[in-house]
Structure formats: C-alpha cells, structure tokens
Amino acid sequence: MTTAPAIVTEERQVELAAAELSRRIPGAAVKACEPMARHTTFRIGGPADIYVQPLDLEQLAEVMRFAREHGLPVKVVGNGSNLLVGDGGIRGIVVRLAPSFSGVQWLDDGVLAGGGARLGKLVKDSGEAGLSGLESTVGIPGTVGGALAMNAGTDTGCIGDLVMSAMMLEESGEIREWDETQLAYKYRHSGIRAAKVTVLSARLRLRPAPPEEIRAKIERLRQKRAGRQPLTAWSAGSAFKNPRGVAAGKVLHRAGAKGMRVGEAQVSSKHANFLINRGRARAAEMKELIERAHALALRRYGIDLELEIETVGE
C-alpha cells in the first residue's frame, strides 16, 4: 500500500520561507502571515506573507538577496501611515526598518537622519538643537524614509524642500547617493516610489534659530492641526491630494462628504479629507468610501481628486 504524498499548502510554504529567512538573519524579527492591521495607522490590513525587521544594513541586504533568489516582491514600510493594505494582505516580504536605522547626526547646516527615524521626534529634537525648517511637518506621523517617499508636508511646506541628498539601497543591493535631481520632488511626489529603493538616510538642510522661537512655532502649528484634524483617530492622514488652487478638504466639505460612512469606515466630521476607522473597518469598506467621496466631488464640482493614500495588497 502506497502512502499519498503530503500536500504542502501555500501557508506552509510561507512558513518554511520565513523560517529559512530567519536562519539567514539571526536575531531579527521574522514573522509569517503577520496581520498588517497591527502595523498601519489605519489599523486595517490582512496578513503579509513574511514580515521582517532587519537589525542592520547587512541584514537588510540579505533580505533583498533572499527576495531576489525566491522571486518575491518586497514592500518597505515606515510607520504604516499613508497606507491602506487590502483585506487579503500583501504577497511577498514586508520590511520595516528597526530602530538601528533611526540614528540622527546634527550638522552645522542641518541633520543627517536615518530612514527609520520618527519624523515627529526629529521635529522636536531639531528645535531643541536650534535648527529650524522641519516645523512644516508638525503633526505628520511616520518615518523620515516614508516622508521622503511621498514628499510629506502641510500647507506651510514639504520635506522635499529640505532634502539635499539621500542614501538609497537599490533593488540590486547596491547603495547609492541620490541628489536633488534624482529625487525629483514635486507636490506629494518623488522619484523614490517608482524606483523601488529603500531610504537608508537623508541629509536635510536646516537653518539656525533660537530654540525658544522654534518651540513656540511648533506648538502653534500643533494646536492648529489638533483643532481641525482628527489626530487621535485611526487614520492614514490626508486621503486626497489638493488639486491646483483649492484644498481637497474644502471641496469634500462643500460637497457634503463630512460624516459619510460605509460600515466602520467614515469621513471625519472634523476634516472632510480625513478618513477614519471607527473600530473594525475593513479595507473593502474604506475603498468604497474613497470611491464615494471621489464620485461626490466629481459630480458636484467636476473635480477629479487624486488619491494621496497608497493602496497596497489584495
């Protein structure tokens, strides 16, 4: 009597791949089928096949080699802000930079910050160091790498205005310095996303100023944002990019989008360009809400709003 061959399920294949990667980068956190809802500010998202936090550059390069060997796509995430992960999750490998990629070195004309450095902390620390310029990013969640990729900013400026150069880990595994031309900054756009590179560090141009003046400006901007945006809600930040000459939030507010709801996904009653998870929202609900808000602006004003939130996964 012959024994039927064991059937290796897709989930088991993922577990085996994760175990192999874990052996190659000892000490790093490697998880199979990790829910991305735990790692996004929306608190939404199905499982990543493999979720990994490499401890250093050598391990990060090894992750990239492993991905190439196995033909796996790689998605690098920062703090998980500005990100909507599908309910079916993300195939391949999701990389989140560990705290060892968060180093900061103060310079005479600015700062050299690791790609994993928290933007909010960098804003505060730059003020204490008497270096001004980052105040325009007050209240924006996420990491330096994520902020560079989307050219994060507010109505007072964008981080791309400050970037002198950045060190990138390219898909090939090579490390290269990118200048302002390669970064190609425009409103909520950079050359980083299309190139599929990982931001290792960035040099930002700042200017000296009295710390007390910077602290006062930071506090004014923080209070302004807290007064009109749902900063404590589960959100991914601004949903749509501002069209030329008008704020997306104003368009949606006038169109009557505030409070609009699909299941547990809702347009904030505080700011119409912020979508919030009321508790157990699914990505499908959030996507339907996005479509409805977009259709409303198009129908009422003929404005074709462009999504600012990045949607990934299945």
Predicted regions and their residues:
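Short loop/turn motifs at secondary-structure junctions and domain boundaries
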Residues: 158-160
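Anion-binding (especially nucleotide phosphate/pyrophosphate-binding) glycine-rich loop
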Residues: 10, 14-144, 152-154
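Phosphate/pyrophosphate- and phosphate-bearing ligand-binding catalytic cores of soluble enzymes
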Residues: 2-6, 31-32, 40, 83, ...
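Core subunits and conserved enzymes of cellular information-processing
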Residues: 127, 146-156, 176, 182, ...
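Short, basic and Ser/Thr-rich N-terminal targeting/leader segments
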Residues: 70, 77-79, 162, 233-234, ...
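Short polybasic amphipathic segments
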Residues: 102-104, 164-168
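Beta-strand secondary-structure signal
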Residues: 51, 112, 165-167, 201-203
